[in-house]
Amino acid sequence: MLIYPPIDPVALQIGPLAIHWYGLSYLAAFGLFMLLGCRRLRHPPFAGRTGPGAWSRKDVEDILFLGVAGVVLGGRLGYCLFYKPDYYLGHPLEVFALWQGGMAFHGGLLGVIVAMLWFAHSRQRPLLQVADFVAPCVPTGLAAGRVGNFINGELWGRFASPDLPWGMVFAHSGSMQPRHPSQVYQFLLEGLLLFVLLWLYARRERRQGQVAAAFLVGYGVLRFIAEQFREPDAFLGILALGMSMGQWLCLPMIAGGVLLWCRAARRRPAVARGSRA
């Protein structure tokens, strides 16, 4: 059994300016996206293309800029609407109080989809081509976010057996019983494992939409599994069929990914060009 080490959430204090570990995890996520996006330019069907439909570093920078806005706005709105709609309908101005915390992955995903729609329209590229480019670059950012969750000592897991060697006591959770370190599980599953599988899969030319579909299914399944060990939000608890809100939100992701895969399987192999598919 392990004891959660109290970690100062402030990484660096310069006068009145406090730099938090959680903010640094977001910065790391965006930096990793930029690095991997530039590497992604070497993968088919993006490598070796010239002309108006060719992908460049400038495209990666623009997607990152739009994606940051999508993650922050979508993640915040998703948290407010999916998890505490009654509260924020009564306190609408607190939606903008980002410093109070409260972000939701599924809301951030919707925000990123809107960002990709904007980018695809402005560049006259197929949306699925954009989604295929972005998808393999996302899991490392999710991993960085889970590191931030662990440092903050938040989103801990459900109670674990006292015999579990890596069971961890989060004293600030109000109980001295060991819990599953679900932040670590999610770091390993939806972060590292999903990245390795998706990155290897995306290195070969696939039909347009298949890489994005693999992300939706892969994340949905791995998050669903991880939610089995994560303590449900206290204000929601366990919902219908014994599932958490996170698990319910994963179901449309998985279904959408399967449908997209079936649709993509009927397409011809993807070609990176400027015209719409």
Curated annotation (Swiss-Prot):
Membrane-traversing stretches: 17-37, 63-83, 101-121, 182-202, 209-229, 234-254
EC number: 2.5.1.145
UniProt GO BP: lipoprotein biosynthetic process
GO cellular component: plasma membrane
UniProt similarity note: Belongs to the Lgt family.
Its job: Catalyzes the transfer of the diacylglyceryl group from phosphatidylglycerol to the sulfhydryl group of the N-terminal cysteine of a prolipoprotein, the first step in the formation of mature lipoproteins.
Name of the molecule in the record: Phosphatidylglycerol--prolipoprotein diacylglyceryl transferase
